[in-house]
Amino acid sequence: HLQGFATSNHYGATADGLVMAYRIGAKLRDVDSFQYHPTGVAHPPHLAGALISEAVRSAGTKLVNGLGERFVDELQPRDVVAAAILRECREGRGVVRDGQVGVFLDTPRLIANDPDVLNRLVTLGHVAHKCGIDPAVEPVMIHPTLHYQNGGIEINGDSATCVEGLYCAGEVTGGIHGRNRLMGNALLDIISFG
């Protein structure tokens, strides 16, 4: 939990691969760059960090603060949306429940405008059920969640590191997507590196 943020990662994700590679001389890059997924569950506390997909925002769900105001274009890059949510909370326009702070994903309005949307966004229904809410009646409280380390082991186009015989691919590598990856990075990794 970097800087107190909930995380979508399991507690066993401790960067052991990066440490091992670094100790034998591999170069690391951008290890100070982390991505915060904008729509992680904030309430109830035992689900903090569970992710709600971008598909929910791309379907038309709006983010609203504690005053009921929309405050960001939800389809902006993750870092822009996450920063806007943090600003609303920091400036006192967030929502507080059981000590958790966040904003609302306005699911009631989405479902009222498109009653069949939950048939397409099945995971939204599952997450709402776990939260103990009916998303057609009550909005989901969300907050940015620590999701991904953008940095990692530096590789070339053949997946080779600067250490002879050490090849790396996948989430242990850094720099392929820059400092602010988009969703679906695993697809690019598989297509590019097999």
Please identify what each model-predicted range represents:
Residues 40-45, 148-149, 180:
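Short secondary-structure transition/capping segments
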Residues 2-24, 175-194:
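A conserved FAD-binding loop/helix module that cradles the flavin
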Residues 55, 126-164:
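FAD/FMN-dependent oxidoreductases across multiple families
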Residues 13-16, 80, 116-126, 145-148, ...:
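Generic recognition of stable, solvent-exposed alpha-helical segments in well-folded globular domains
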Residues 20, 26-138, 186:
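An anion/pyrophosphate-binding glycine-rich loop and adjacent beta-alpha core
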Residues 35-37, 143, 147-148, 177:
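Histidine-centered active-site/metal-ligand motif
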Residues 1, 158-182:
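Short FAD-binding loop at a beta-strand-to-alpha-helix junction that anchors the flavin cofactor
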Residues 66-67, 157, 192:
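Short, ordered coil/turn segments that flank beta-strands lining enzyme active or ligand-binding pockets
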